[in-house]
């Protein structure tokens, strides 16, 4: 089934070229189907790239989804044209009286700052509080996962001695969990971060379950026992060249950055990267949408939280 997004969003042309079914708003309005209503709070600086990556995964499922793009009003984006934001994005003030089947909170390159020093932290706290009664299930990604774990459960983020950067092997540590259905015994996920949440800190919280982790990258998937909060510390949505872009960007800035691990053949940046996480990324988003949103959300969204 298709994703339903604004007619002129730049991602439309890219996704159509990849044979991902994208439905125009006009066509969708003439179908007698209630699509899942999914909001994406996009706090990445490269918003157009990130929205395309997420829409690619959301559009590769058999479930019709209506997408609402959100941005923090308290933050001025330096890397995305204001015209794009004004045309395709809404602010929290515009949607706070609405209800959603699902919410995705993206990562952001601010993990080395205390949460309270991030200029949109107060607004993000307001959104996460609102989500308890207005969103059925929320998927938090990378720094968004750290922020959600800290806000909802008091789990701290801790500095790493060096950046976790590359594509790493992961293992399931729970069986018979719907989010993990169909996962390989060993699966790969990109990571790009300077901080972590530790197994010990998460394990102290009775309401949380650690579902998957990596010997090198640490805790990866965490879920609340009711399935309404999913936390993914990696970037399964990344496209083939995102880590390459980040590596070259940091080199240009003169930063001390290592070649991303297990990404370039022979760790040679002159070679084409190998994508090992595409299947996992598609399955993660499919399982979240199907088992944690579609099969659980009330038909009348105003019944969320009741």
UniProtKB/Swiss-Prot annotation:
InterPro entries linked: Class_I_gatase-like, HST_MetA, MetA_family
Residues that, per the record, bind substrate: 163, 192, 249
GO term, biological process aspect, one: L-methionine biosynthetic process from homoserine via O-succinyl-L-homoserine and cystathionine
Compartments reported by the entry: Cytoplasm
GO cellular component labels: cytoplasm
Pathway as given in its UniProt record: Amino-acid biosynthesis; L-methionine biosynthesis via de novo pathway; O-acetyl-L-homoserine from L-homoserine: step 1/1
Active site (catalytic residues): 142, 235, 237
Alphabetized Gene3D superfamilies for the sequence: 3.40.50.880
Chief place where the protein resides: cytoplasm
Sites marked Important for substrate specificity: 192
Keyword annotations: Acyltransferase, Amino-acid biosynthesis, Cytoplasm, Methionine biosynthesis, Transferase
EC number, UniProt record: 2.3.1.31
Enzyme class per UniProt: transferase
Residues at the site labelled Important for acyl-CoA specificity: 111
GO molecular function, one term: homoserine O-succinyltransferase activity
CDD domains per record: GATase1_HTS (cd03131)
Keyword Transferase: yes
Catalytic activity: L-homoserine + acetyl-CoA = O-acetyl-L-homoserine + CoA
Protein family (similarity comment): Belongs to the MetA family.
Its job: Transfers an acetyl group from acetyl-CoA to L-homoserine, forming acetyl-L-homoserine.
Name of the protein in question: Homoserine O-acetyltransferase
Upper taxonomic lineage: Bacteria, Bacillati, Bacillota, Clostridia, Eubacteriales
Record gene name: metAA
């Amino acid at each position: 089934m298709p994703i339903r997004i604004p007619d002129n969003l730049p991602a439309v042309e890219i996704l159509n070229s990849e044979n991902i079914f994208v439905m125009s708003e006009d066509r969708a309005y003439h179908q007698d189907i209630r699509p899942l209503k999914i909001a994406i709070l996009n706090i990445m600086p490269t918003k157009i790239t990130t929205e395309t990556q997420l829409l690619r995964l959301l559009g590769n499922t058999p479930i019709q989804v209506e997408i609402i793009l959100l941005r923090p009003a308290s933050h001025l984006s330096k890397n995305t044209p204001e015209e794009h934001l004004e045309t395709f994005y809404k602010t929290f003030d515009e949607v706070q009286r609405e209800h959603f089947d699902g919410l995705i909170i993206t990562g952001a390159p601010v993990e080395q700052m205390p949460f309270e020093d991030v200029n949109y932290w107060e607004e993000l706290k307001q959104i996460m509080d609102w989500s308890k009664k207005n969103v059925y299930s929320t998927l938090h990604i990378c720094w968004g996962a750290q922020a959600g774990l800290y806000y909802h459960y008091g789990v701290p983020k801790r500095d790493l001695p060096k950046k976790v950067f590359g594509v790493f092997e992961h293992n399931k540590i729970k069986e018979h969990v719907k989010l993990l259905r169909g996962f390989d015994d060993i699966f790969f996920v990109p990571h790009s971060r300077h901080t972590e949440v530790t197994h010990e800190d998460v394990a102290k919280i009775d309401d949380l379950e650690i579902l998957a982790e990596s010997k090198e990258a640490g805790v990866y998937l965490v879920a609340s026992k009711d399935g309404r909060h999913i936390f993914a510390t990696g970037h399964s949505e990344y496209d083939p060249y995102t880590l390459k872009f980040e590596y070259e960007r940091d080199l240009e800035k003169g930063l001390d950055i290592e070649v991303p691990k297990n990404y370039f053949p022979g760790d040679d940046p002159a070679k084409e990267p190998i994508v090992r996480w595409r299947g996992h990324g598609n399955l993660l988003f499919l399982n979240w949408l199907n088992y944690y949103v579609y099969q659980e959300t009330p038909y009348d969204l105003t019944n969320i939280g009741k």
